[in-house]
């Protein structure tokens, strides 16, 4: 196969490649077998017309497009391999020459993976973070657990305070007219939770059970409902009941209620301390990794093709939709609830996608600079891990992974991150 690659400005180039006569003939033969199955030609049973009759009646050129569709995936893949390029999207292929009995000539404007100019990536300074669990952190966790065991008790003849839960009716009015979505009865609301628009919960503080009030507020300018954004409204409210949290004492009995595997508060503290210590060490390690990667990426230069960003954004959007589905929602419902649009969400995803794409490109470049190649032992170990995780046989995992290119790429990137971490200087 004759292949020519002409690098142009940026990350785009022109790929010229040929399909030789013998290969063209193979494609035409396969195309005829495909087309003949659907043909109805007088004098012949369906799907039984001879090739010679087909050529006389329709012309061999009638098979060209089908033959090209059949051959193109194979010959294009071979062409990019011979040209030594790494396309980042599927280009439009143009026909330069497609004459009978001759070699076919095709061209494609191909966007390729960009070159990365690495900056400093070894010996990068990172913040030294404390990994030892503090007494304050343990006490804060115990307080949270203690408050989770709290019971709500009715507050008799006392005003509502932040932290109390009130049961109320409310109805919102704009210009004296009730607006949609502004009404509820026997609604439970924890004061200070920030569930309502600014000012609503604050103005309930001080009211008692049985009180009625008119609360004058202005909706935020960025509120999702355009007809209410920035508009003054009045909420008519009636408090039916006020409940306050009754927090139990932090003792052995509470410890057993929190965790049935312990008998005393000291045992609970020891168990929680171990969990929090491990979590803090993991958090510190993750923060160090993120910081050193961010600095290596910042020091590198790369011109990222928009196609890569767009593809990654699409990937993130698909994950977002799957996460919503797991919660019983659809993207359409999410946009309706939040007032956001799909276009705005995709634009935000593109910002995140650009960061992810650059990070991966830089880490791949570091792996290449360090001549990192995963060993067979590392590959086999990763396959064993995946097999155990998903409850599959190792051979099934290997079959699912195919040529292992994705797995090898992941292992290379992990090793590249290790290079950054091992050489980082904590200060």
UniProtKB/Swiss-Prot annotation:
GO MF terms, alphabetically ordered: peptidyl-prolyl cis-trans isomerase activity; protein folding chaperone; ribosome binding
This molecule's function is given as: Involved in protein export. Acts as a chaperone by maintaining the newly synthesized protein in an open conformation. Functions as a peptidyl-prolyl cis-trans isomerase.
User: Can you quote the domain comment?
Assistant: Consists of 3 domains; the N-terminus binds the ribosome, the middle domain has PPIase activity, while the C-terminus has intrinsic chaperone activity on its own.
Catalysed transformations (reactions): [protein]-peptidylproline (omega=180) = [protein]-peptidylproline (omega=0)
Q: Which family does it belong to?
A: Belongs to the FKBP-type PPIase family. Tig subfamily.
| Annotated gene | tig
| Keyword tags | Cell cycle, Cell division, Chaperone, Cytoplasm, Isomerase, Rotamase
InterPro entries associated with the record: PPIase_dom_sf, PPIase_FKBP_dom, Trig_fac, Trigger_fac_C, Trigger_fac_C_sf, Trigger_fac_ribosome-bd_bac, Trigger_fac_ribosome-bd_sf, Trigger_fact/SurA_dom_sf
Q: Does the record's keyword annotation contain Cell membrane?
A: no
Pfam family for this entry, one:
Trigger_N
One Gene Ontology cellular component: cytoplasm
Q: What is its EC number?
A: 5.2.1.8
One of the GO BP terms on file: 'de novo' cotranslational protein folding
The PPIase FKBP-type domain covers 163-248
Listed name of the protein: Trigger factor
């Amino acid at each position: 196969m004759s292949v020519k690659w002409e690098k142009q400005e940026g990350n785009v180039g022109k790929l010229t490649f040929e399909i030789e006569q013998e290969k063209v003939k193979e494609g035409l033969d396969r195309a005829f077998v495909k087309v003949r199955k659907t043909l109805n030609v007088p004098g012949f049973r369906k799907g039984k017309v001879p090739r010679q009759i087909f050529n006389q009646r329709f012309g061999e050129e009638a098979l060209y497009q089908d033959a090209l569709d059949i051959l193109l995936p194979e010959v294009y893949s071979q062409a990019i391999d011979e040209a030594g390029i790494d396309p980042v999207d599927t280009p439009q292929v143009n026909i330069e020459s497609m004459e009978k009995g001759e070699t076919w000539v095709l061209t494609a404007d191909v966007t390729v993976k960009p070159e990365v100019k690495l900056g400093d990536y070894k010996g990068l300074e990172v913040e030294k973070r404390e990994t030892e669990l503090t007494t304050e952190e343990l006490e804060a966790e115990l307080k949270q657990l203690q408050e989770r065991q709290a019971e709500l008790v009715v507050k008799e003849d006392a005003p509502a305070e932040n932290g109390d839960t009130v049961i109320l009716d409310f109805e919102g009015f704009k210009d004296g007219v009730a607006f949609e979505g502004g009404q509820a009865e026997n609604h439970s609301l924890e004061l200070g939770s920030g569930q309502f628009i600014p000012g609503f919960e604050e103005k309930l503080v001080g009211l008692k059970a049985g009180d009625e009030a008119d609360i004058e507020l202005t909706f935020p300018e960025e509120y999702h409902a355009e007809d209410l954004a920035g508009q003054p409204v009045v909420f008519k409210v009636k408090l039916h009941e006020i409940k306050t949290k009754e927090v139990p004492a932090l003792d052995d009995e509470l410890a057993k209620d929190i965790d049935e595997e312990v008998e005393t508060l000291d045992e609970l503290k020891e168990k929680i301390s171990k969990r929090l210590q491990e979590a803090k060490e993991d958090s510190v390690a993750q923060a160090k990794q993120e910081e050193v990667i961010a600095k290596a990426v910042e020091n590198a230069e790369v011109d990222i093709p928009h196609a890569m960003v767009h593809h990654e954004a699409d990937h993130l959007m698909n994950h977002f939709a799957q996460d919503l589905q797991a919660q019983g929602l659809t993207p359409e419902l999410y946009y309706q609830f939040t007032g956001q649009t799909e276009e705005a969400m995709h634009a935000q995803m593109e910002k995140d996608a650009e960061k992810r794409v650059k990070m991966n490109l830089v880490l791949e470049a570091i792996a290449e600079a360090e001549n990192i190649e995963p060993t067979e032992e590392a590959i086999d170990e990763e396959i064993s891990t995946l097999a155990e995780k998903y409850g599959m046989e190792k051979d099934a995992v290997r079959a699912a992974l195919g040529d292992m290119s994705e797995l090898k790429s992941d292992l290379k990137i992990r090793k590249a991150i290790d290079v950054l971490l091992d050489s980082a200087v904590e200060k």
